[in-house]
Amino acid sequence: MTDPSNLFDTAMEALGNGDIDGLDLLRKSAEMGNAYAQNNYAMILYSGDLVDKDPESAFGWFRSAAEGGIDESQFHLGLEYYEGNMVDRDYREALKWFRVAAEQGYPAAQYYLGLCYYHGNGVFRDYGFAVRWFTLASDRGYSPATIALADAYMDLKNPDRNYKEAFRLYRNASEAGDERGYYKLGNCYYKGKGTPRNFIEASKCYRKGMEISKDTDCQYMLGIMYIKGEGVPKNHKIGISMVRDAAKEGNEEAKAYLMRLAGQNIIDIEDPAELMLEDTNTPDIIGGVKGAGGNKGIFSFLRRR
């Protein structure tokens, strides 16, 4: 009888050499119970690399691999329960799987476990535990956790709030190239939180965030600064244009700002439908699952034994 571990190794070697037949070997190894194969096959189905996307089948393989102790699958299983995509939302079940993966040192799971404690999802709210898990993930270089940790230190409801520490963390995240880090750092300079108010530095941060990822929050804030002449030469035309562009990309603050100006007959609205505000309660602290197994190219995220 073929050993599933050897079959897995053969499959990974084949896939690494660009041989699509390795996918069949990987599936066979998964069906024989190899947890690493189950995880990798789930990731392929989840991402849509090599095959059509099949989230439902991926969920089943994530569960099998999670029960086999694979931290990546434990995280993804928890994420499905947290977001309620393939199954009904169940924060307690999400918390269970995040904790198992987090205790194995998986940064994205540590981050989401911190979110559960921060927002009280599936557990009593506890800022101390949230900060602990954010810190562990941040120390492993997971930038969303660095941002979340800084957000926690900025939170007025947090008894241990620390603006200077938040500023330091935002700066670290931005220096690591995180676009949200530049936006948050810009806000610190703009509002004078954790550092003296400095409109010039704020404008630099917002501009950098735009250059990296076309961040619409940065675009909106830089537009406001042009309108007011804060840190940049006052230019109403450029400012309104930037705010309009941010609104067209769905930025809610930009939409609301333009609606206020239109209500005061300061500007005309070209397409009122574009400024329809969305009903969203998504907390600002929640970010994407950066580096947690997204579609980055098939060979960059498959696990080996």
Language-model features, listed with the residues they occupy:
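Short helix-capping/linker turns of helical repeat alpha-solenoids
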Residues: 2-3, 18, 31-34, 47-49, ...
